Structure formats: C-alpha cells, structure tokens
Amino acid sequence: MPQLRWLGHAAVELLINKKRVLIDPMIKDNPLSPVKLDSFNNNVDLIVVTHDHYDHLGDAVELLKMNPKASLFATFDLEVYLSNEYKIDMSRFIPANVGGFIDFDGLKLALTKAVHSSEHSDPSGAIISGENITVYHAGDTGLFEDMKLIGEVFKPDYALLPIGGRFTMDPYQASLAVDMIKPKKYAIPIHFNTWDLIKVNPDDFVKEVSKRGYRALVLKPGQSVEL
C-alpha cells in the first residue's frame, strides 16, 4: 500500500508502486526534518522539485549524486539550469513542463501551474499517480482559480497545500483551494511552522476545510500515513 511521510516544511517522501519519491527535498537545512540526508543513500528512485528556491530545491543535487539510478522531475528550464550549473548529464532528468501525464516506470507524473516566484524557471506544482492513488503537491503557491481545473483534470486523492501565509496561501485561503480541488480523501497542510515568518495554527485549516465538507489531515514531521 502506498505511504506518504511528511519530512517537515514542503519535503515529502512518497512510497508508491515500489518506488521511493522525494518531493522538494530540503533535508539538511530543514529544522523540522526528522531524518538525516544519508538515510536516502542509494535508495531513491525519483526526485521532484517544484521550483528552485533553496527551501524546495534543497538537497536535490546531492541526492542525485547519492542515488546514481535516480531521476529528477522538474520544469525543463530548471533541469537545463541544474545540468549546466552542476554538470549533471541531461539523461538524469525527465523533461517536462505544465501539461499532461508523463509515464515514468509505472508512475504517471505531471506538472501544474503555481502562482509564486522562482530563480531560474517558472514555479510549478506536481502530480504523482500510481497504484490507483493520485497525489497533488502544490509547491509554493498563492490561491488561483485554475485550481478548479487541477481538481477536474487530475482528480487527486490527496492535496498537499502550503498554509504558512506570507509567501504562500494562509489557512483560510488554502481551505478555499481545497473547495476548488476537491480531494477525494484528504487535504494535508505543508510549508508552515518551519520558521517564525510562516507560523500558523494548522487547526484553523482543519476547521475551515471541514466547513466546506472536506477532510484535512495534519501530520507531524516524520509521521507517515497509508494512502
């Protein structure tokens, strides 16, 4: 059965279709991380990066070196930058942009729109689908109306949404996102309480989501849930 583990901030580990997937893997500089980077030595299959702010690109480059069989999934512009900057062969990347599903070794992957900023490419969200489960990781984003289309097109079971405010949606705005995305199982808050600037009460998110007829699940750093 697929499992999801929140690693603090926006970092998520997904075990799905016999693959270990790391999304926005900031581990070393993550004050909430329950794990050390060396726990992901030679056991990661896919690294997903929504954009290249340091708290999302994180340790992706080092993880590629630690996992010679792993691939990295991001926008093509970001992949080209990483290839040139860190001398990584382009064969390690899965070329993509916002659009439809891409098949990757039994998984289906897609990138979605996100409303944010980024260093070397447009920001994105990510869709990972396998074993009849679809997970939407919104990356960093503000609220935008096309979230309705993300729900309609990809029909996620789980929506991982930033709620820390200031740089992304706050709990109330994220609850409006849930109402548009309509996750079939749970909305899971991310990107909050890592630092004082994004300190919020996740229970506010849970209450607002419940008012709209959906369920939210707050994980502690290191906590896993079966999907």
Curated annotation (Swiss-Prot):
Stored InterPro entries: Metallo-B-lactamas (IPR001279), RibonucZ/Hydroxyglut_hydro (IPR036866), UPF0173 (IPR022877), UPF0173_UPF0282_UlaG_hydrolase (IPR050114)
Keyword Ribosomal protein set for record: no
Alphabetic keyword roster: Hydrolase
Pfam families membership: Lactamase_B_2
GO molecular function per UniProt: hydrolase activity
Family of this protein: Belongs to the UPF0173 family.
Protein name: UPF0173 metal-dependent hydrolase Saci_1512
